[in-house]
Amino acid sequence: LLCYIIIPFVISLSACSTIKDGPSVSETKYFSNEVDYPKWYADAPKKDDSAIYGVGTEYSNDFQFSVDKAMLSAKRELASNYSSYTSAMMKDFAVESGVLGKGVANADIERTTRLIVAKVNLVGVQRQNFMVVKEGSGFRTFVRLRFSADESNKIMLAEIQRNAALYAQLRASKSFRELDKQTNKIEEQKIS
């Protein structure tokens, strides 16, 4: 009989107690408002530098696609900065489709850029800075491109000079053919 009284009493007392199962864990998560990026990504060019710069950053689950998209973004910015000086036709297209992180959310990223730049040789674009970091299940790439107007002008001047030499040769051969033709006419008139 004592057993019937003590067991319910012990059970009722144990129901009022709390069980601690290890150190307390806070459910609060803290998020930073700042995004980590390389220092050079936001640095302004030196005042005496006449070059034009473009930066880009992109994310992808695929390493190479992350790099390609970041280069495309930097070129797009570079071209838009350059377009205030002139106008080239450049079409860029990038598509990514996939699962982000471990969730089931699908992301389709589609970008089309069309910048009109006519008769401009954009040779001389250099990748000045480059960095890839692991971010979640993918990769984030940061790129900084530099386009030196001075170097570009040297290249264009060399191309113009080469074309001028070719044009001079063409004119000289054309003039010689005309002279030869005129000489033949005179010879034919003397014979008739």
PLM region descriptions:
Residues 3-12:
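Bacterial N-terminal signal peptides
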Residues 16-192:
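Domain-level marker for long, solvent-exposed, non-transmembrane regions
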